[in-house]
Amino acid sequence: MIACTATIDLDSSTATLSSRPQPIAFESLQQLKQLMTESSDFVQGDLADFRRAADNVRLAQLATILCATNLGDKWSPEGTALIGINGDGCALNNRLFWDDFISHGHDNGRASLFVPTLPSIPVCEAAIALHIQGPVRYIATESATLLEEAISDMFATDSTLRQIMTVELFNRSVRCALHTKN
């Protein structure tokens, strides 16, 4: 059962939470982060490395914090798993890395562009930001195919899980949902 959702869309510069009727408008991910960290209305996450992260990591971090915020005082990182699923979340980063590699070669290319090309990095960084104390998994599948099976399997095989958060990244947006056992 989906308990709550959150989305961030860079094209419309809005963030939505299922528990709030009005979207949050922002001009940049840095501004959205500032709005969230300066308000006690949001779950506070560890965003110490936010400025150094690629946009796909920033999107995952902020969306999971927004999703957790939907739960208010009921949010807890204990017994929470996080699953990252396909979208096209790393495609832009893959292209940036490849173009830099082709232009500058192995010795002069920017190695820092490599890390965000790994599809598990955004979801792992989101888990760190929320201090999630459960498993983190990346599944390369369409959101409508193996995801529900993976969620059911995780709940069935791990009795300590209370909830599973899913993060689906696209180049300029992210969808996050929190699934509960019942």
Name what the model sees in each region.
Residues 1-182:
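Conserved "HGTGT" condensation-loop signature of ketosynthase/thiolase-family condensing enzymes
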